[in-house]
């Protein structure tokens, strides 16, 4: 709108005659008052250089604002696309960490198996040595063994894992119960007969004993 007004004013200024018009019947020596007013009238303020510069600055600022808005929109679109790309990468990293690092529950089960193996339970002889070595290394805080995945150990323990815990799940609550599972090499002795049990021998003054009062 400002640009249109500026062009109209410039066109009007260019269309104005440079020299006063000589009317018929008037001598050049006696100018008309209206012509003098027209010639002597000051140049309109609208056509000054300062106003023209201000109008040009306003038009330039509007164009720069439009460009800034477009640049901001492009930046937002680029940031949203980059954030969408970053999200799946973080999810993949979490999934990889879950596969590599063993869970606390798994380590607890493994500790139970190794502890029960000390009681010479025959069913626990199938525990692989790799599981024992890995558990000891993780307890000592060796980072080389902690970074190794537990997939191989899980495959070794998969075939006997549920059956052992169904049979020995009570041993964790009652540690003394492990002593009831005797090793295979033990020999069972027969119980003594009633004839071998000696009769109790009492003193003669047993009937005269008095109990102290507390």
Curated annotation (Swiss-Prot):
This protein's species is: Capra hircus
Phosphoserine modification, residue list? 61, 63, 79-83, 90, 130
Family stated for the protein in its record: Belongs to the alpha-casein family.
Signal peptide limits: 1-15
Tissue expr: Mammary gland specific. Secreted in milk.
Quote the protein name from its UniProt record: Alpha-S1-casein
Q: Which InterPro entries match?
A: Alpha-s1_casein, Casein, Casein_CS
Please provide, in alphabetical order, the Gene Ontology terms of the cellular component aspect for this entry. extracellular space
Query: Pfam families per the record?
Result: Casein
Instruction: Quote the annotated effect of residue 210 to A.
Output: In variants E and C
Per UniProt, which keywords does this protein have?
Answer: Calcium, Milk protein, Phosphoprotein, Secreted, Signal
Q: Where in the cell is it found?
A: Secreted
The record's region (Disordered) falls at: 59-91
Query: In its UniProt record, which GO terms are filed under biological process?
Result: response to 11-deoxycorticosterone; response to dehydroepiandrosterone; response to estradiol; response to progesterone
Protein function = Important role in the capacity of milk to transport calcium phosphate.
- The gene designation is CSN1S1
Remaining remarks: The sequence shown is variant form B.
């Amino acid at each position: 709108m400002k640009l249109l007004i500026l062009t109209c004013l410039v066109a009007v200024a260019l269309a104005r005659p440079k020299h006063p018009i000589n009317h018929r019947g008037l001598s050049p020596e006696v100018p008309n008052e209206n012509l003098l007013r027209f010639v002597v009238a000051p140049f309109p303020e609208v056509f000054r250089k300062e106003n023209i510069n201000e109008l040009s600055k306003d038009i330039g600022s509007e164009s720069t604002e439009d460009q800034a808005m477009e640049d901001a929109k492009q930046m937002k679109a680029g940031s949203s696309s980059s954030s969408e790309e970053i999200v799946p990468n973080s999810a993949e990293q979490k999934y990889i960490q879950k596969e590599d690092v063993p869970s606390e529950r798994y380590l607890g089960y493994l500790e139970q198996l190794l502890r029960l193996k000390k009681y010479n339970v025959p069913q626990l002889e199938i525990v692989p040595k790799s599981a024992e070595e890995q558990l000891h290394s993780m307890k000592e805080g060796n980072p080389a063994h902690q970074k190794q995945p537990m997939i191989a150990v899980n495959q070794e323990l998969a075939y006997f894992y549920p059956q052992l815990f169904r049979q020995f799940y009570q041993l964790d609550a009652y540690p003394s119960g492990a002593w009831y599972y005797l090793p295979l090499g033990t020999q069972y002795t027969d119980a003594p007969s009633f004839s071998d049990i000696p009769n109790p021998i009492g003193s003669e003054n047993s009937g005269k004993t008095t109990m102290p009062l507390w």
